[in-house]
Amino acid sequence: MASRKPNPDQLGLLLSQEPAAKRARRILCGVDEAGRGPLAGPVTAAAVVLNPRKPIKGLADSKILTARKREALYDEIVEKALAWHVAEATVEEIDRINILHATMLAMQRAVQGVAALGTLPDLVQVDGNRCPQVAFAVEAIVKGDALVPAISAASILAKVTRDRQLAALHIEFPLYGFDVHAGYGTPQHLAAIDLHGVTPHHRRSFAPVRRALEGMSAISIETVAAGSAWDD
């Protein structure tokens, strides 16, 4: 069961009243996600507790880093962090409970994964304006991926992991360009859906995919009707 969480103003006051030495010893867990907007693939979340004795240079919002830089930082984060865990919510879960709740679920799983390793955060800091239900104090930080190093690290782990998943998906479905757009609704991706249809990895609750399915159903009905007329 999640503990009662103070509101952001209360939390900021509590933190400001703590002695500096105590704040320095706090175990802070950064959390971020990747893949809320795409039409295909899971939504991925990561939780990271950095080691203050092993600083990592160059941490930043994963979206402004090159793929090469993200990959290099991924390896360094995994090596130096006190604890980290990457989790996801599947396409089926996204379609069943919606993308917002699925994102919160993935974040919750990521934090639980860190705790399962024996690292219990004093504070979980989440990018954005919403917090998952976790058994620790938690705060949301808008643009946290650019402001809080642990959240930056989490954003990098989440994005690199998801990009690798979509690159692997491209091998299975090479006609869709998943290795290029990572499932986002680019013109190339939308054209591929129109031409080749929807895969099991597409989010049927998302409007462009839903419209494509409805169009395919209409074509099927017309084809059956035309066949019946021909038989008559």
From Swiss-Prot:
Cofactors: Mn(2+); Mg(2+)
InterPro entries: RNase_HII, RNase_HII/HIII, RNase_HII/HIII_dom, RNaseH-like_sf, RNaseH_sf
Record-level GO cellular component terms: cytoplasm; ribonuclease H2 complex
Main location: cytoplasm
UniProt cross-references to CDD domains, sorted A to Z: RNase_HII_bacteria_HII_like
EC identifiers of the protein: 3.1.26.4
UniProt keyword annotations, A-Z: Cytoplasm, Endonuclease, Hydrolase, Manganese, Metal-binding, Nuclease
A single BP term in Gene Ontology: mismatch repair
Binding-site list for a divalent metal cation: D32, E33, D127
Cofactor binding note: Manganese or magnesium. Binds 1 divalent metal ion per monomer in the absence of substrate. May bind a second metal ion after substrate binding.
Pfam families reported in the protein's UniProt record: RNase_HII
Every RNase H type-2 domain range: 26-218
One of the record's GO molecular function terms: RNA binding
NCBIfam families xref list: PRK00015.1-3, PRK00015.1-4
Annotated function: Endonuclease that specifically degrades the RNA of RNA-DNA hybrids.
Entry similarity comment: Belongs to the RNase HII family.
Protein name (Swiss-Prot/TrEMBL): Ribonuclease HII
Gene name per UniProt: rnhB
